[in-house]
Amino acid sequence: TFTPRELVDEVKKAQLSCMSLTDHDCIAGVKPVIEAAGGDVEVIPGVELTSEVDTLEIHMLGYFIDIHSEALKKELTRICERRTSRVHEILDKLKQKNVRLDAQEVFAIAGHGSVSRLHVARAMLAKGIVSNVSEAFSRYIGNEGPAYVGKFSLSAENAIKVIIDAGGIAVLAHPYSQQCDELIPGFIKAGLRGLEVYYPEYSPAVRRY
């Protein structure tokens, strides 16, 4: 995880003139990055909202959002509160399995970002409870694990609306990974304006797809 200054430095090293920070369900890092850029790099305010269609998790990117939008901040606060509550529920279930983890250890790892199961897994790794993050998911907190707790998510259409209402442009994140081709026409009707094509795991063939 980079600090805002380190992130801007990496962008400069790559000889890029523009960047966007799109943390999951969180905009706390946007202003510090803009300040760190100091006008040397254009920073597009962004966010990545977690949403669902039935049981399928869908990630919606929002670019050019107004980070001062009260409606957006209210929605993100609601999501953050649910994520925090979820962590406590997970820790209670882990305790029932004689796995003891302090909530503050998890929140310290999450920092100012939105807390998630990944941070629980990293805290378990730090305490030597598991040998790697994957083990934490497979043995304890994954969807089939004994300490699994479902997440609160927006509907995909509502995620698009939240982005648009905040003055942003809604873009479907890594669509090939999400295998949701048949849902895209409905997303477009709801206001979707783009698809993420350049993603670290995508080959040229996938990008063309």
Enumerate the predicted regions with their spans.
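Conserved acidic, metal-coordinating active-site core of Asp-based
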Residues: 110-171
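An N-terminally biased module of ancient metal coordination in phosphate/nucleic-acid-related enzymes
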Residues: 1-56, 140-142, 146, 161-164, ...
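Alpha-helix N-cap and loop-to-helix initiation/capping positions
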Residues: 78-82, 151, 202
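Conserved phosphoryl-transfer catalytic core
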Residues: 81-108
